[in-house]
Design a protein with these regions (language model features):
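A contiguous, surface-exposed recognition patch within enzymatic or periplasmic domains that forms
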Residues: 165-258, 301-312
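Extended terminal and domain-junction accessory segments
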Residues: 13, 36-47, 139-190, 290-337
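N-terminal, post-signal-peptide metal-ligating segments of extracellular/periplasmic oxidoreductases
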Residues: 3-108, 188-239, 324-337
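Histidine- and aromatic-enriched segments that form or immediately flank copper-ligand environments
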Residues: 42-153, 242-243, 249-285, 308-334
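Amphipathic repeat-derived elements
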Residues: 120, 129, 138-159, 166, ...
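Short, well-ordered beta-strand elements within core beta-sheets of diverse protein domains
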Residues: 119-121, 228-230, 242, 289-291, ...
Length: 337
């Protein structure tokens, strides 16, 4: 018997609960190219509940989750190759209508409360995609119904697109910003009427925990040590980062140690590959792809091939939680090993 989700039976999860729902993921998007296309099946359960933020406040979310007893925000990262067929089953455990959508690829249409729907579609073009709930836009996306899909070129495990600069490993950085007043309105099936004022900022669903803070170094709650977000590598371990923004706020993604190679912007291959220490990321589903080259940091003296360097956003509010807790926002670390 399936456990019904209702207003009196919410899931309540700390950030650790989110990470445990993704247990088994190493953080890296692992891929081995195939000679032929395949069908990839995945089932998502649309669930709801509360997630405790760094300042202890419980905020309402909805998620594409792996079962009825979980709340996963963002949804699981998926990877396929050009020509594959995706068979996605959506089980809507809620009383409200939702959908599964990837722009220019698929739209499930309305999935009523309590309904299960299976959709099939081909992924024909390599790149980075956000899947999300397109109904009641942008509200269902903002409260957590989103995730990332990577599509690899045929026969390649080291290129973003045919002829792109090559990489050794790859990650998603999926950013979101959270206004708890809006989330509460959506919980009560109301359209938010207040000015958007985000108080929490996440990367892959987690926020930072600075040294000395409870949870620092715990990968289940600390974005700076979350294996999905933190970059680990030796010199030469060039890392593709697929960067998506589910939130409303514009961001500037800033890495220390190395400039990044900026390859795409909003799904379009750039005419030139720029080396940038800050990469602009549009709000409302902005997307970029970039390679962190893991080169010996050029400004280090004496020269150093190991060390820890931050990645943070250059919008100062995004580095806070609850309106002022600094270093509890959307950030992670880069480990030269």
């Amino acid at each position: 018997m399936k456990k019904e989700m209702n207003r009196r039976n919410f899931l309540k999860l700390s950030s650790a609960g989110i990470a445990s729902a993704l247990l088994g993921s190493t953080g890296l998007l692992s891929w081995s190219p195939r000679a032929e296309a395949e069908t990839i099946s995945k089932t998502f359960y649309i669930t709801e509940g509360f997630i405790t933020q760094p300042d202890g406040v419980d905020v309402y979310f909805r998620g594409f989750s792996p079962d009825t007893n979980s709340l996963t925000v963002p949804g699981a990262q998926m990877i396929a190759q050009e020509g594959d067929t995706m068979r996605i089953t959506i089980v809507n455990t809620l009383g409200t209508s939702h959908s599964f959508k990837i722009d220019d690829v698929v739209d499930s249409g309305r999935i009523y409360g309590g309904q299960t729907k299976t959709i099939e579609f081909k992924v024909n073009n390599a790149g980075s995609y956000m899947y999300y709930d397109g109904r009641n836009a942008p509200y269902n996306r903002l409260v957590g119904l989103h995730g990332g899909l990577a599509v690899m070129p045929n026969g390649r495990d080291d290129e973003l697109y045919d002829g792109s600069p090559r990489f050794v490993q790859q990650h998603f950085w999926l950013f979101n910003d959270i206004d708890p007043v809006w989330h509460n309105a959506i919980r009560n099936n109301r359209t938010p009427s207040t000015r958007y004022s985000p108080r929490y900022f996440t990367i892959n669903g987690l926020s930072g925990r600075p040294p000395g803070a409870p949870g620092n170094g715990d990968p289940s709650i600390d974005a700076m040590h979350d294996h999905r977000s933190a970059l680990h590598g030796h010199v030469g371990d060039r890392t593709l980062v697929r960067i998506l923004n589910a939130g409303k706020c514009q961001q500037s993604v800033h890495t220390h140690a190395n400039h990044m190679e900026w390859l795409t912007e909003n799904g379009q291959v750039r005419d030139d590959v720029w080396l940038k220490d800050c990469i602009y990321l549009e709000g409302n589903m902005g997307q970029v792809d970039a390679i962190f080259p893991f080169e010996t940091p050029p400004d280090a003296y004496p020269a150093a091939s190991t060390g820890v360097y931050p990645m943070h956003l250059h919008t100062e509010m995004s580095q806070t939680a609850g309106g002022g807790l600094y270093m509890f926002g959307a950030m992670t670390d880069i480990f030269f090993e």
